[in-house]
Amino acid sequence: MHVQANLMIKPSDNILTCNVIPWFTNFTLLFMIISAFSMCCGYYERIKSGAITPAKFYAKRYHRAWPFFAMMVMISFAMDPSWSTFCQSFADLTMCFNLLPNPNIEVIGVGWFLGTVFTFYMLFPFFTFLLDNKKRGWMVLLLSLVFCYIAIVYFGTPDFVVKPIDKVNIIYSAPFFVAGGIIYLYRQGLKSWVERHWMIALASCLVLTILRFVVDIKGLFILPDLLVFAAWLMYAIGSKDIVLNNKVAKYLSGISMEIYLCHMMFYRVSSMLHLERFIHNNDMLYVATCLTTLIGAICFSHVIKYYVFKLLKKACTKGKFGI
């Protein structure tokens, strides 16, 4: 999606390039649901029982997300040093930049998603309280949808904010995080049902996805995407098919955050190759640019995560840097 939006030479117009690919930007909403579900798997019971301290909980969150993001911020600042990029880089490095009233950060622009998710991490103990039981969880989901709607149509006007409220805002994104938490509360029953009726579950997901594109959804604000992405996660919980359960999917999921954060850097690298000099078909040029961007991002993410960071961690453990 980002490649298509930034390409000077656009691919031909069709249902794929005009409707489907632009919708890929909403996958960040799916990742919010998955983030909430995975956080609940790891910390929901531990937070409720007090089995983990705040220091350990937040240290783990920084340890997981900060190193690679910080490296990308440093690279971006080095490429374009200025007072503006310094201020934005500083905000990025705190991981708290979504607490700003109108965060419009261009240094690692795609990092807005990480900022929103990290705000969710900050609120996770409160989130655990809100989802203390299934009944309360449904009530919270309903209230979050109402609050999201009010935020968009009332508080999202120029009288209150500089720009409309969107995915960057935690109130807008809250229903997706809550949905992930509710799916966690029902995980055992969902897993059992999908395992027994996987064809019905898969067909339901496909129908919902198709309806998302063929039905007029204006006026339904976030509900269509919420239903589609929640359905796919519920299917994934009990799915045993090769599409979602294979070595490639498992490998890519391990570096998905890194790929997301660095892919625009490799789009710029791909642009420097001037592939348009060798490929004169616009559609093929788009495919080639996507492939070079994706391959570069995957290779870079793999090397940094599994080699560079491991070597640095090993060196620090041995005290080579006096730590």
Language model features by range: what are they?
Residues 16-28, 103-116, 154-179, 209-232, ...:
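Interfacial loop-to-helix transition and helix-capping segments at the boundaries
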Residues 33, 37-45, 120, 124-132, ...:
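Hydrophobic transmembrane alpha-helices
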Residues 47-56, 83, 127-138, 185-197, ...:
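Membrane-interface helix-boundary motifs at transmembrane edges
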Residues 76-84, 93-154:
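Hydrophobic alpha-helical segments with transmembrane-like composition
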Residues 1-4, 78, 96-100, 143-156, ...:
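Aromatic-anchored segments of alpha-helical transmembrane domains
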Residues 4-11, 79-82, 152-161, 210-217, ...:
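Juxtamembrane "helix-exit" motif on the non-cytosolic side of transmembrane helices
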Residues 21-34, 41-80, 84-96, 120, ...:
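Transmembrane alpha-helical segments and their boundary/interface "anchor" motifs
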Residues 78, 177, 204-310:
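Alpha-helical transmembrane segments of multi-pass integral membrane proteins
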